[in-house]
Structure formats: C-alpha cells, structure tokens
C-alpha cells in the first residue's frame, strides 16, 4: 500500500513539474514576444520620424511623384540585429493633397458644388460599378452626415434613417474625424470602402484634410479623371506619363494644357503644391509587425511639420 502511495505521489510531482516547465517556457516566449513588439514599435516610430525629416528637407517649389518623399515605398531597411528573426522597416508617404477633401463638401449647411461634382464623377467611374444616380445618393448621404441640419438631401440620410437600423446611432452633423467613419454612412459598404481585386477602395482616393485644391502632380489617376467631365482615360494616361518623366515644367498647375487639348480644368480646383501628407511606417520581424500611421501638415515657408493625428497598431 505504501509503495502505491509513493508511486502516486511521484506521478503527481512529475505532472506538476512538467506543467511548471511548460508554463515557464510559455512565460519566456510571451516575454520575448513582448520585447520584440516593443522594439518593433520603436522601429516603426523611428521610420515615422524619418518620413517627417524627408518632408522637411524637400526644397522644391512644387510637389511631384519623383521626389524623395514620394519614392519611400522603395525603401526597405534591415533591422536584423534587433531581432532573432529577420527584421525590417518599411516606409510609405502619401500625398493627401492629391485626394478629394471630403470635409470641404460642406460649408455649414451649404454644399460645395465643385467637390460634390468631383465625388459624383469619381464614384460614377466604371471601376466602382455604380450608376450615376447611386453615386449621387452616396455623395448626398456624405453631405447629410457632415452638415449641421436634419434635412435629408435627395437620396441622403439623416438621424431618422440611422436610428432605424438594428444598431442605431445618429448622424454626425459635423466634419469627419477619421476616414473609417465613412463605413457608418448610408450606401458605403466594406467593398466600396476597401476595394477588392480589380476594384479601387474609396478610402484611398479621399481625405479629411486639404484646403480644397488637388495637386495634379500627385493625384491618383481616378482622381484626375474626376477633375473634369471631359477627362478621358486616354488623357489621364498621357498626364500620368508626363508627370512621371518631366521636371521643372510641373511647377505651374496649367502644365496639363501642353499635354492634352480640348479639356479644361477649373484652375481654382488644382495646385502643384502639397501641405498634407500621410506617413505610414511598418516595423516587421517574422510574423509580427507594428504599424505607426499619422497625418502631417507641412508649412511651405518654414518647411516645419506638425502632427495632426497618429495611431499605432
């Protein structure tokens, strides 16, 4: 009997020891993961600071796709010495001034017809698969989300619509604070917002920032097509090729007139200088990654940058 008790006690001790060993190894693994994640955060944050330096060091009188800050997507910096697995830093700087400024759609309760028309033309392009009426309804819903009244605009929506949904909420009745607020607006689906294979994402073509003028040197091709009802795919391809291969002649907003004929763009809608940028820096090691993203405004006279918003994930 005593032998059986001893054997049982030994078995219990072995099980406990194995469990403690497993727990200890798990804690060590978790600690290593936490250490690497902290390191990745600082790697990504350093990349974000590097992006701001590149913007401050830009001395050109205009902004284009061939500048140092615009080609950071080609930069991959190894950080292997900091991690047990391969590590790297990736940096991308996007020109927010080349996108359509959503918050300029409304001034108080009045609609900005120039921005409205650009958005309708943008959403009406074949890549989005929407007809003109549907595109207009979505723009009206964005307008209703931002304006301060509760009057429904055409096919738009106010709080009366949103309060009838399974997860009820009210219309913002104020400027958009983050781009993913668009997903709360009537008519904007995940597919429209994010895009998919062969389809663009609305989030990549619009911005919360900007004074209302769009930089034609950096605007995505779909945004270029929305600048005029006469703009064609062929004309945009010519403009895109020219701005990627030309130099100083991109300083004037009217340079496009030398490349395409018979298409007029309102000069009040375009510029060749940019003030707002989005910096995205990724620190990665193995399957782990940390991204620091933020919006930055740059003063053209002092070349100083100011952080408007940022997040780490």
Question: Which residues does each predicted region cover?
Answer:
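Compositionally biased linear targeting/interaction segments
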Residues: 1-313
């Amino acid at each position: 009997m005593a032998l059986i008790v001893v054997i049982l006690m030994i078995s219990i001790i072995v099980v406990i020891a194995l469990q403690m060993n497993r727990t200890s190894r798990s804690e060590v693994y978790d600690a290593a993961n936490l250490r690497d994640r902290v390191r990745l955060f600082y790697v990504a944050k350093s990349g974000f600071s590097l992006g701001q330096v590149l913007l401050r060091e830009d001395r050109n009188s205009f902004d284009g796709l061939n500048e140092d800050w615009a080609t950071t997507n080609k930069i991959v910096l190894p950080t292997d010495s900091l991690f047990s697995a391969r590590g790297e830093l990736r940096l991308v700087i996007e020109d927010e001034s080349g996108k359509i400024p959503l918050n300029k759609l409304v001034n108080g309760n009045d609609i900005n017809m120039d921005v409205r028309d650009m958005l309708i033309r943008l959403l009406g392009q074949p890549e989005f698969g929407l007809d003109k009426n549907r595109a207009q309804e979505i723009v009206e819903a964005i307008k209703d989300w931002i304006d301060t009244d509760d009057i429904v605009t055409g096919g738009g929506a106010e709080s009366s619509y949103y309060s009838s949904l399974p997860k009820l909420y009210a219309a913002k009745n104020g400027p958009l604070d983050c781009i993913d607020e668009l997903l709360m607006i009537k008519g904007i689906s995940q597919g429209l917002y994010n895009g998919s294979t062969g389809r663009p994402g609305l989030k990549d073509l619009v911005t919360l920032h900007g004074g209302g003028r769009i930089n034609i040197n950096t605007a995505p091709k779909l945004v270029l097509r929305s600048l005029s009802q006469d703009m064609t795919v062929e004309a945009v391809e010519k403009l895109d090729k020219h701005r990627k291969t030309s130099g100083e002649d991109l300083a004037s907003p009217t340079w496009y007139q030398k490349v395409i004929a018979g298409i007029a763009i309102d000069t009040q809608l375009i510029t060749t200088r940019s003030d707002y940028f989005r910096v995205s820096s990724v620190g990665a090691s193995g399957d782990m990654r940390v991204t620091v993203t933020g919006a930055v405004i740059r003063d053209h006279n002092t070349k100083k940058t100011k952080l408007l918003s940022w997040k780490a994930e």
